[in-house]
Amino acid sequence: MKLRNAEKRLLIAVSQIIENEGFSKIGVNKIAKQAKCDKVLIYRYFSGLEGLLAAWAKDNDFYTLAYQAYSERVTKAESSEDIIKLTQTVLLKQLNFLRTNKLMQELLAWELSGNSTFRSIQNERERNGFKLQEELEKKLGKESKDVRMFITILIASINYIVLTTRQYRIFNGIDFSNPEAWELCKQTIYNRALFENILK
């Protein structure tokens, strides 16, 4: 279904406010003013602020986008080798997406601050991320806590490194202001030996 012009403006307004002022400034009145819309439209089209943010997340949250992009590729994978390569691809995409996407950085930082009352975005991310995980496990023919925890640690590590190095360039003795550090990070994700004992 095509979005109405007002719906598009409201979604764009959310992005603009987050990018320019931070997630803490999000509110119905501010969004409506930024979008040049009556705030009643937020309730009419999205059932309120939570619904608007959930809709926004579908276009801006990595794992919501990743599920749409990769779920079919998981089901078509023919071997554990394919699964390893696909898992590495998704993790590398996550790294690149988060490094270059200020909106996603602001969202995660706000959630981690403990001040976020907007559960809809996190719930949407968890739902889509876990569906992708379930499809991966189904393809491997097993439900493995080791697989799930392994991927969870990698996802969390990527998030934490990117967010931490926004403020502090050195982490565990590695200078992340140096492009070589990020290349090494990518090479580590592509390290076959790291994955094959868990995913095979």
Where are these regions (language model features)?
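Amphipathic alpha-helical packing segments from all-alpha helical-bundle domains
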Residues: L65-A69, L107-G141, R148-M149
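Amphipathic alpha-helical segments used for helix-helix packing
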Residues: L95-R119, T165-I170
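Hydrophobic alpha-helical connector segments
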Residues: Q68-T100, S144-I151
